[in-house]
């Protein structure tokens, strides 16, 4: 076995450990917070959980259509250009993609905020669901550009910043959720809708922390100055072609990644409305039922899904590197090890 192959296997192992640990910790925190949170919501626990889940399903859908496949596609392109010795193409692509994804985040955040009343009505959540969805639109503003930076690190086979940013995001998010839920329900007004709204706004707070971690590691590794300072030779690079090439790479990931979220959206848009036609259940009772069959099981199943998908994505930059070099034997060995 060559030294290069051994080095790639070590890189893949380190990346797998970092991403698996971060995904497991993040999802576990996302499942564990519900215990004190649910208790503090008192008699409105199930309704609050239902509102939270309905808001998050729409929010996750917006994240999906605005960023699905971007981290992996960016990682693949960065690995390709670096292997060819065209690092300036990587930095040019990142500069262009950060601008493009920031604009995309702004557009989708506005759309989600403005259409929240429509989505709330279609979901059967009523007016209580509107502020919950609107609070989540702020996170949509940040996430697309943040996903580009994560993909950039993945393309350099440095998954430590990616992993730590995920953990920081979840830790800060859960802290904000629990603090605001406690103070609103136990010290303040006791308005559970306000508490849920702050709990969903925590996604924005968590992403802010995650973005700070990523920027810190960009600065620490010396990559930030290469992104900020555009060399004169950059004007000779067709940035639009680089962007389109990367977007084209992301399309398969968008298609394959949308299935689970699409099924959840269909459930959300149909359950309460259909049940209200054929039963005498109130909106609150239907919200409780939705919470039982949709909200709680997903928190557990997503732990396993996140861990499995993280393992599959780690080797993509290394596979790209071997493919560009024409070393199909090394690529096959990586697939076998993965």
Task: Name the predicted role of every residue range.
Residues 38-60, 192, 196-197, 241-249, ...:
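Interfacial/gating helices of multi-pass transporter permease domains
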Residues 53-77, 141, 294-317:
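Small-residue-rich midsections of specific transmembrane alpha-helices
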Residues 1-32, 88, 92, 234-260:
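N-terminal membrane topogenesis motif
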Residues 165-179, 188-223:
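Hydrophobic alpha-helical transmembrane segments
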Residues 80-97, 292-338:
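Specific pore-lining/lateral-gate transmembrane helices of multi-pass inner-membrane transport
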Residues 143-165:
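Membrane-interface junctions at transmembrane-helix termini in multi-pass inner-membrane proteins
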Residues 20, 94-109, 250, 338:
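Selective transmembrane-helix segments that form parts of the transport pathway or gating/packing helices
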Residues 107-125, 130:
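Short membrane-interface helical motifs at transmembrane helix boundaries
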């Amino acid at each position: 076995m060559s030294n290069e192959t051994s080095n790639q296997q070590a890189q893949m192992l380190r990346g797998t450990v970092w991403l698996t640990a971060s995904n497991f910790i993040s999802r576990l925190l996302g499942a564990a917070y519900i215990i004190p949170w649910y208790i503090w919501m008192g008699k409105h626990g199930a309704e609050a959980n239902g509102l939270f889940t309905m808001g998050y399903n729409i929010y996750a859908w917006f994240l999906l259509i605005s960023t699905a496949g971007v981290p992996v596609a960016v990682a693949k392109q960065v690995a390709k250009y670096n292997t060819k010795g065209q690092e300036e193409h990587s930095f040019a692509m990142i500069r262009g993609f950060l601008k493009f994804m920031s604009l995309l985040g702004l557009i989708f955040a506005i759309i989600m905020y403005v259409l929240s009343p429509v989505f709330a009505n279609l979901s059967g959540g009523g007016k209580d669901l509107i502020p919950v969805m609107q609070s989540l639109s702020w996170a949509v503003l940040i996430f697309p550009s943040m996903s580009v930076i994560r993909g950039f690190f993945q393309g350099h086979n440095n998954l430590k910043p990616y992993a730590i940013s995920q953990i920081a995001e979840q830790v800060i998010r859960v802290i904000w959720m629990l603090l605001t839920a406690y103070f609103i329900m136990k010290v303040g007004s006791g308005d559970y809708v306000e508490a849920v709204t702050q709990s969903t706004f925590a996604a924005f707070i968590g992403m802010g922390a995650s973005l700070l971690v990523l920027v810190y590691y960009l600065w620490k590794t010396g990559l930030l100055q290469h992104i900020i300072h555009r060399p004169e030779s950059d004007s000779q690079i067709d940035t639009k072609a680089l962007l389109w090439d990367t977007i084209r790479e992301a399309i398969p990931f968008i298609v394959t990644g949308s299935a689970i979220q699409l099924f959840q959206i269909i459930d959300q848009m149909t359950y309460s409305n259909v049940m209200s036609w054929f039963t005498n259940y109130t909106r609150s009772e239907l919200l409780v039922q939705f919470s039982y069959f949709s909200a709680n099981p997903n928190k557990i199943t997503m732990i396993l899904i996140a861990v499995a998908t993280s393992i599959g994505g780690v080797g993509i930059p290394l596979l790209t590197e071997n493919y560009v070099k024409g070393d199909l034997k090394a690529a096959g060995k990586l697939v076998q090890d993965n």
